[in-house]
């Protein structure tokens, strides 16, 4: 696939940060979880740096206990370098999501017995300014083939993990999950996105997320609090 202006650079962390991603899947993915939590695509200071969905550096290293070699994209944006474990910036969305998981479940093992976190699209799209451009804002001629490939990949993930339900983190992820899984019978719902671009999340994402989980039929019994 090729992507034109306003996109100037495309990163695929599954290539240059393959080792941490493989550790994440091998250590934490299991069949039959209560819910697959589905994000959209990598953020420039999260998965783009670590290879882990919502991969805020500190959370990945200190709570998930994942490390490993991280390379660089073949064509790196000068304003969005991949510094890997040395990235000084903290992704707010990842800090909120993994911070909630830590405080609610205590250990990764307890959390991943119930959930798994993945992204719908593995690619990060950057404009010349360094601004992140999400897949839904790509031109239709580029977007449609991308979505078709990501839909197929999502069906493969769901087939492998057999989650009881898929919860899109944000409306776009929910919509894509509904479209991709329409023929499978897997229930699809949503969680509010923890991004600071979501004003409601800035007023308190955790209670919103837990309300959405319960509404989707996910019990939080057995969590620490």
Language-model features, listed with the residues they occupy:
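A polyanion-binding, active-site-adjacent surface
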Residues: 1-165, 174-175, 189, 199, ...
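Short hydrophobic/aromatic-enriched beta-strand-loop microsegments
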Residues: 184-193
């Amino acid at each position: 696939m090729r992507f034109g202006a306003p996109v100037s650079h495309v990163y695929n962390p599954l290539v240059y940060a393959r080792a941490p991603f493989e550790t994440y899947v091998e250590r934490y993915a299991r069949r039959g979880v209560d819910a697959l939590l589905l994000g959209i695509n990598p953020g420039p200071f999260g998965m783009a740096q670590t290879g882990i969905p919502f991969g805020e550096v500190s959370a990945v290293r200190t709570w998930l206990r994942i490390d490993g070699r991280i390379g660089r994209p073949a064509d790196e944006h000068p304003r969005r370098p991949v510094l890997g474990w040395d990235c000084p910036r903290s992704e707010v969305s990842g800090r909120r999501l993994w911070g909630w998981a830590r405080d609610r479940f205590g250990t990764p093992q307890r959390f991943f017995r119930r959930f798994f976190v993945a992204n719908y699209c593995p690619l990060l799209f950057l404009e010349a300014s360094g601004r992140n451009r999400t897949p839904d804002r790509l031109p239709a001629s580029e977007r449609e083939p991308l979505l078709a490939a990501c839909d197929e990949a999502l069906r493969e993930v769901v087939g492998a993990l057999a989650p009881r339900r898929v919860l899109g983190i944000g409306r776009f992820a929910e919509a894509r999950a509904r479209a991709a899984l329409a023929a499978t019978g897997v229930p699809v719902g949503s969680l509010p996105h923890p991004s600071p671009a979501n004003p409601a999340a800035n007023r308190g994402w955790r209670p919103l997320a837990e309300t959405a989980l319960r509404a989707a039929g996910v019990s939080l019994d057995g969590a620490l609090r």
